[in-house]
């Protein structure tokens, strides 16, 4: 089912339900021979081997930072992704003391979780939550803590385990991030967001400290290519792949109503397309034979969703591409159970996906459907859907009107949406971008994870030399009559910048 068809059907259904308030699932078709390594079953558990040595076959230590940048049960998939990644690294022999995990940790024991205390990342998968270290959880999952951990700065971290990447010149570092994003930004459950300009500076500082040999970064988020496009140097010994290019969405997968679908008791997406692609690849390959480039090409092919890029995305690569021939075990470890696996990737191909920015609406709608009869909980769920859609429409119309006020009624929308040519960064002045975001939110309410997509509009306002005073005037005119109490930055945990 195409995402646009789902969205239209959702809106029609919502209108019908709202009007009423005022006055056998298709089984997923699975190849019977396919069994994922995390699939439930006593035989698979009994065959699980002992972990491999952490530093086998090379001098140095493997380090990893895993970040789930969201919170809330509707964003189940991001923490599922990160927990799954942690399981892969642990089975590969990467020591827990060398893995730093950022996750809000509000999913496994959530009242909506049909299997309390567990998290799954695959429709037929087993628990990926058990044994995952909770280094930074809840309010400790911040951009500042992430940067401090990466830099190995123990005095700069706030709360948590205090664990940091205390790496040495011969060590290898793997960073994996999964969440919502927008042009030039990555989400965090505690504001402000992570901005590309700041992230690149931190990577440069890490390189200047001579505290690693090579680093590999995987990023799952909408417009994730914009974090590195025109910004990522090629001389830092850092290789990056992203789920999407600088101008497109990434996609959730294993979602309710899609094929393959999660177990019927789940009302939210279990994973993200790029993320499950690389993890299911790593689980079914000998990582002492598979190279970084091998995985990039396989993940690129799968994430394009058979070239249906209206339901898939372009996986991109940035930074230093000279060491793509290195074997993946240097970063993800080696699971002895995969020692005799031939490099033939086997996966169930999703028939459809859900736009990252629509996945929360899908969850809310499934939650509404799940509630029986006419109850206060069901009416509350309906109001939440209506409020969320109304705020989205408000953001859409406000940004559009600000563009017309700033650039003229004829050219405004095009000026806001214009993407720079390949190789150029999103914005010339990152401080200006942050200021424009704060001005907008002060008058128009929080951007939310949906509104992150408008970061390019704010960047273009900066790139065209619009003053703060003019932006404030336009924001007041666009939003002066909007009651933003429900969506105030103070209510939503602060400003996005």
Curated annotation (Swiss-Prot):
High-level lineage: Eukaryota, Viridiplantae, Streptophyta, Embryophyta, Tracheophyta
InterPro entries per record: AE, Legum_prodom, Legumain_prodom_sf, Peptidase_C13
Family per similarity comment: Belongs to the peptidase C13 family.
GO CC annotation terms, alphabetical: protein storage vacuole
Main location: other
Signal peptide boundaries: 1-23
Cysteine disulfide partners in this protein: 255-269, 432-462, 444-479
Name this polypeptide is given: Vacuolar-processing enzyme beta-isozyme 1
Organism encoding this protein: Oryza sativa subsp. indica (Rice)
GO MF, one annotated term: cysteine-type endopeptidase activity
Classification via CDD domains: legumain_C
One of the protein's GO biological processes: protein storage vacuole organization
Purpose of the protein: Asparagine-specific endopeptidase that may be involved in processing of proteins targeted to vacuoles. Cysteine protease required for post-translational proteolysis of seed storage proteins in the protein storage vacuole (PSV) of developing seeds, by processing of proglutelin precursor to mature glutelin subunits, thus contributing to the formation of protein crystalline structures in PSV.
Site (described: Required for post-translational maturation and enzyme activity): 269
Top-level EC class: hydrolase
Glycosylation site list: 153, 340
EC number: 3.4.22.34
Catalytic activity: Hydrolysis of proteins and small molecule substrates at -Asn-|-Xaa- bonds
Subcellular location: Protein storage vacuole
Post-translational modification: Auto-catalytic activation.
Entry keywords, A to Z: Disulfide bond, Glycoprotein, Hydrolase, Protease, Signal, Thiol protease, Vacuole
Active site, UniProt feature: 180, 222 (nucleophile)
